[in-house]
């Protein structure tokens, strides 16, 4: 009896570790050689719903370089936000990288991608964008409602977030749009992918809609390169991939012969251009310098990298405040978005014996606001050590932050090594374009007004003027690392000194330059890129969750009993299912439409799976 119970518990633990999905396996279980209709590289925010949809009719392989998000409290629980980002271990779901600008950043290394790490903000695309895309508004709204039953929730608006809302209205960011998932100028309360119990719902949860017999997901399976063939082909054609399992053994996955079989890269703004280069698609000289055989000289791979700058001001509070991520946003007409996050110890679980400081941790780099070039590991270690001796009361308060739309400044990405697990070298050139700096200054001025407003007076010390708050933020995480004494007098200096990321980096495989309007890689066949690397800039469909990666579609499903979603009201005629993952580090929006394709509302990119 005891043996049977132990076996049952072991089985249940294993199954729930996979989210209850029988098709998720460790890479060590993969056959040495296998064949599929579609091979999706990256089981992130874009890859998961794409795979779930395609699996209704085709055989799909998903290769995820990271592990499972299920049963990981640092991912699941809102109260632990920041812990995963602070985890710098090799098995962490977050992989830290530092741009050549010196800004600390992170990329997902887990099934579900950025939705397993982000602050969870959820939004719909605006109705003007839907109209411009040419979608059937009724079907789109019907689909939004369906999705929102699964991943979108109304956050509880407590005292600190209520004060932020009232302050935004007091300083004139109007009208008040209440709780809405739409993108509207003014002040609003948005949705969240955290439910009422503070549990995260990621894009990996959308695998529940997959056809179990049509999909295979391997974890800890980084792809080394895409394989190409030219035999009997007018130009290079993707034929499969080589991936490595957790024990270091190589496996070969090939496309089945057929007109529709494809390799689809969904590895994100860093991973996708990196993988193209490692596979021989990129600037010829750069590839040759790394002894990579050139399949196609494509000088624009890795170009046009952008990251939306974020700047924040920490406001210590004389009274306890709730733990909250982004809930209230002020959408302005000048190109900046005002938001806030709060909480004692900022997400650090109070039951933990050790203190990793959650969102406050210098390991994250978000609020380690030394100028980028001074954010050395030695400085961060010194800050962490100093913070350990501070009382918990020192961490009570919140951040008012601003993020600029766009941005206009651009950089580039290059390989460091031939190892796909290593971070490439990326430069974003923050504030290189004067327009970005001007937007930042305007945003900081609005933050000052919010902090000085009557509505926010209960949550700030009256004896601390704005100049002191700016200097506190500019000088240190929790006042420990000194810097420019004049930061409060020069907002331009403050913007430059305290620039951070909000994880909305994008570019590297732009539409019209690296991929065509159908997201097919130009110059080769049977290969697409579908993620934020295709974006020229982040569309402002949401005040804080600007689109970083998009776009997921499925094929027209002929003669298939349904369109891939349980209990959905399908049409009798031929159904087209279009899944649009309008996602950044902080959004998940899925749209079902009657048009074959998806479109980025701002850029006007449409993709058709033909």
Question: What does each of the following model-derived ranges do?
Answer:
Residues 405-413, 509-527:
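FAD-binding beta-loop-beta segment adjacent to the flavin cofactor pocket
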Residues 539-553:
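A conserved FAD-binding loop/helix module that cradles the flavin
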Residues 116, 129, 134-238, 244, ...:
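Conserved redox-cofactor binding core of oxidoreductases
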Residues 524-536:
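Short FAD-binding loop at a beta-strand-to-alpha-helix junction that anchors the flavin cofactor
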Residues 60, 66-71, 136, 226-235, ...:
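Glycine-rich loop(s) and the adjacent beta-strand/alpha-helix scaffold that form part
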Residues 11-132, 138, 243, 293-300, ...:
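N-terminal glycine-rich phosphate/pyrophosphate-binding loop and immediately adjacent elements
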């Amino acid at each position: 009896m005891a043996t049977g119970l132990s076996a049952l518990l072991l089985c249940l633990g294993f199954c729930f570790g996979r989210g209850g999905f029988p098709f998720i396996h460790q890479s060590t279980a993969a056959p040495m050689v296998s064949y599929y209709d579609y091979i999706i590289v990256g089981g992130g925010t874009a890859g998961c719903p794409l795979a779930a949809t395609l699996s209704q009719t085709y055989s799909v392989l998903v290769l995820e370089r990271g592990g499972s998000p299920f049963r990981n409290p640092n991912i699941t629980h809102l109260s632990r936000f920041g812990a995963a980002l602070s985890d710098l271990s090799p098995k962490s779901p977050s992989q830290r990288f530092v741009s050549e600008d010196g800004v600390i950043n992170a990329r997902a290394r887990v099934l579900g991608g950025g939705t397993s790490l982000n602050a969870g903000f959820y939004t719909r695309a605006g109705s003007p964008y839907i109209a411009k895309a040419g979608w059937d508004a009724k079907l789109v709204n019907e689909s939004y409602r369906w999705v929102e039953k699964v991943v979108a929730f109304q956050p509880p608006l407590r005292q600190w977030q209520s004060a932020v809302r009232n302050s935004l209205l007091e300083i004139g960011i109007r009208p008040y749009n209440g709780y809405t998932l739409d993108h509207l100028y003014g002040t609003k309360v948005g949705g969240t992918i955290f439910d009422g119990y503070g549990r995260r719902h990621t894009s990996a949860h959308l695998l529940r809609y997959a056809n179990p017999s049509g999909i295979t997901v391997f974890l800890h399976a980084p792809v080394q390169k895409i394989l190409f063939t030219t035999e009997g082909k007018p130009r290079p054609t993707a034929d499969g991939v080589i991936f490595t399992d957790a024990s270091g053994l190589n496996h070969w996955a090939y496309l089945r012969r057929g007109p529709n079989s494809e390799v689809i890269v969904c590895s994100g703004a860093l991973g996708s251009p990196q993988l193209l280069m490692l596979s021989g698609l990129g600037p010829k000289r750069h590839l040759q310098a790394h002894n990579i055989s050139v399949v196609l000289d494509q000088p624009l791979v890795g170009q046009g990298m952008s990251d939306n700058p974020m700047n924040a001001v920490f406001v210590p509070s004389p009274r306890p405040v709730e733990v909250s991520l982004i809930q209230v946003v002020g959408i302005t007409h000048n190109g900046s978005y005002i938001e806030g996050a709060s909480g004692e110890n900022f997400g650090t679980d109070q039951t933990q014996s050790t203190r990793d400081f959650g969102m406050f941790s210098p390991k994250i780099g978000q609020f380690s606001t030394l100028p980028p070039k001074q954010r050395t590991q030695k400085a961060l270690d010194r800050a962490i050590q100093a913070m350990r001796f501070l009382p918990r009361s020192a961490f009570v308060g919140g951040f008012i932050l601003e993020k600029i739309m766009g941005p206009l400044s651009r950089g580039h990405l290059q390989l460091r090594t031939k190892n796909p697990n290593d971070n490439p070298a990326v430069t974003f050139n923050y504030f290189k374009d004067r327009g970005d700096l001007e937007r930042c200054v305007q945003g900081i001025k609005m933050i000052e007004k919010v902090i000085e407003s009557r509505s926010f007076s209960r949550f700030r010390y009256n004896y601390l003027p704005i100049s002191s708050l700016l200097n506190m933020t500019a000088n240190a995480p929790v006042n420990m690392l000194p810097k420019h004494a004049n930061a409060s007098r020069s907002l331009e200096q403050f913007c430059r000194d305290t620039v951070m990321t909000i994880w909305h980096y994008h570019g590297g495989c732009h539409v019209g330059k690296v991929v065509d309007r159908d997201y097919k890689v130009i110059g080769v066949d049977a290969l697409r890129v579908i993620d934020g690397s295709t974006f020229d800039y982040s569309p402002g469909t949401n005040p804080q969750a600007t689109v970083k990666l998009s776009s997921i579609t499925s094929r027209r499903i002929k003669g298939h009993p349904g369109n891939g979603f349980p209990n959905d009201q399908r049409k009798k005629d031929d159904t087209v299912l279009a899944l649009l993952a309008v996602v950044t580090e902080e959004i998940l929006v899925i749209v079902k439409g009657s048009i074959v394709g998806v479109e980025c509302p701002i850029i006007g990119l449409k993709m058709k799976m033909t």
